[in-house]
């Protein structure tokens, strides 16, 4: 994603959005390949991501655009976008500032399932969500 490259409309036209106009985006650390999160994108959020080089998603719960880190400061600088062979899933390779997960961990995939079915924390807590977002009511 060079500085002088404009949005390639042919890429946007190959993206296969679902019947809700969404496509899943798997987000990875661009240096380590660690999976940080999965989020949904619509055409507008994908265009915004391409233009700004900052990850923008579509919040299904809030029904609006969601610039990652807008309220927490935990932004994602986008280095690469990959599209799968079917055109219906994306990978965003990012540099994550702070934690990707809204509960404070570096990755949303911070719990490992053990053989006995129990779970254990397997990631680093990056921030206290109550300090960032306030207490839930």
Swiss-Prot record:
Details of cofactor binding: Binds 1 Mg(2+) ion per subunit. Binds 1 zinc ion per subunit.
Protein EC: 3.5.4.19
Residues that, per the record, bind Mg(2+): 84, 86, 88
GO BP term, pick one: L-histidine biosynthetic process
Residues that coordinate or bind Zn(2+): 85, 101, 108
Pathway named in the protein's UniProt entry: Amino-acid biosynthesis; L-histidine biosynthesis; L-histidine from 5-phospho-alpha-D-ribose 1-diphosphate: step 3/9
Enzyme type, top EC level: hydrolase
Reaction catalysis annotation: 1-(5-phospho-beta-D-ribosyl)-5'-AMP + H2O = 1-(5-phospho-beta-D-ribosyl)-5-[(5-phospho-beta-D-ribosylamino)methylideneamino]imidazole-4-carboxamide
Keywords: Amino-acid biosynthesis, Cytoplasm, Histidine biosynthesis, Hydrolase, Magnesium, Metal-binding, Zinc
GO molecular function: magnesium ion binding; phosphoribosyl-AMP cyclohydrolase activity; zinc ion binding
Entry GO CC: cytoplasm
Entry's localization field: Cytoplasm
Cofactors: Mg(2+); Zn(2+)
Principal location listed in the UniProt entry: cytoplasm
Family that this chain belongs to: Belongs to the PRA-CH family.
Function description: Catalyzes the hydrolysis of the adenine ring of phosphoribosyl-AMP.
PANTHER family: HISTIDINE BIOSYNTHESIS BIFUNCTIONAL PROTEIN (PTHR42945), HISTIDINE BIOSYNTHESIS BIFUNCTIONAL PROTEIN HIS7 (PTHR42945:SF1)
Complexes and interactors: Homodimer.
Name under which the protein is recorded: Phosphoribosyl-AMP cyclohydrolase
Organism expressing this protein natively: Chlorobium phaeovibrioides (strain DSM 265 / 1930) (Prosthecochloris vibrioformis (strain DSM 265))
Underlying gene: hisI
